[in-house]
Amino acid sequence: METDLSVIACIADIHIVSALDQCLSDLALPLVFVHHAKQISLIDKQRFLGLQPVTSLEENRALLYRVYVPTGYETGIMQRIIEATDLKMGGRGCIFSRTVHLLRGTPFSFDTDKLEKLCGKTDKHPPLDHSLISCTISRGVGEALAHAILELGVCVPVVFFGSGVGLRDKLGLLRITIPVEKEIIWFVVPRSDAELIERNLIPRARLDVPGQGFLYSTHVRAPVVNLRVRQGKRLHAATMEQVIAALDEVRGSSDWRRLGSRKNKSTSSISTINTRGVFFVGEEDEVERFRKLAMANGARGATLNALEMRSYNAADHHEHGMISHSRQLCDIITSPEIENKILQAIAQSDLFNSKSTCALQTFNVETPSVIRASAPVADNA
């Protein structure tokens, strides 16, 4: 089965997880992937004898939900999640969505009557006014990057962990120079600031040096972004993130608070290459088959993440009990030509049979040319 669906990503603080689970159960959504993450912010700590406070990083546990929904109900479902979790309160999390092309062996069973009643259907969607910047680096480097972006005040970074495969397998003894454990950091920023953020990240993480990491960006709809970059005592009737959210609503966008200037943008802009995201979710043996198939057809690197597959459909719960299974996500960033080769090879295999629950999603991403030009690989190793 091939179709276009929307993927809603919701990063939820651990304290609002129960409210989010109840909301997803009310909507009877059949396919949700969940994994652990953390949100990083700044906190000012008082020193002994009232000396000048010290600023340090504060980590808050969170869960990252990837929710598959029909595109027509995307806006209504996001709004219902926001209201159910009171997500607009600073520090609770963020939510965004994008449209993907999905390939799956078994069809989805959405309760469209319930979605129509609770969320409503619309063909009009908000603009893709934000960018998701995803940075894959060696474990231990993420704190410095998070601190740098927090100082700019554009968003609260989201961090989760994975492992790199592909490139290391081809290096022989040299593979010891590239750690297998990876940190994946997400920054959800206004599109007007995306280029400036990338300019900060690339030299700090040495992403223009082969083997140091990988970065890509994709445009998303983000009705709520976590702007509580600094924690501390509340000194006024409204917090700074509440003031910013109100001004965004009044002005109709976040462009008024862009960090960079529009002047001379053409001469200073980063050159990017249009690439494709190829994300496969399945059981461990299915992921290994897909990875080998992709590598055999030109993909040079991938990142693996452990996920939990959930169904919030009451019928599934009654038939199979609590539907919750361990899964793996294998994500590859590659050229459109390599993507076509991978899809042709999949079509000739039995990976997506009638009983298979694995899924493959593809979508457009942009990669800075300085990374691809300097790296010996075209993908995220």
Summary of predicted features, one role per range:
Residues 1-381:
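Positively charged, small/polar-rich N-terminal and surface patches that mediate targeting and assembly
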